[in-house]
Regions:
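Long, charge-rich, low-complexity alpha-helical segments
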Residues: 26-69
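A short, structured beta-strand/loop element
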Residues: 2-42
Length: 69
């Protein structure tokens, strides 16, 4: 499983402290919502500058980690 901590951070100064992909203002929540709505990974990558292929599995790993706790 991918180590989501390499790609995701929380900072109270960025997006009200929601988990975001490092160096961006793209929230994990946003990506997970789009995936749940059926948006393809490639569409997300094409439409959101700063989003990289490794961010998709990192978002899923983060969600799995949160659900385990």
């Amino acid at each position: 499983m991918i180590d989501w901590k390499q790609y995701i951070e929380r900072d109270p100064q960025v997006m009200l402290g929601k988990p975001v992909f490092k160096g961006t203002r793209i929230t994990v929540e946003f990506v997970l919502e789009r995936l749940a709505q059926g948006t393809g990974s490639q569409d997300l990558l094409n439409n959101y500058q700063g989003l990289y292929p490794e961010h998709i599995p990192a978002a899923l790993a983060y969600a799995a980690s949160v659900l385990k706790s």
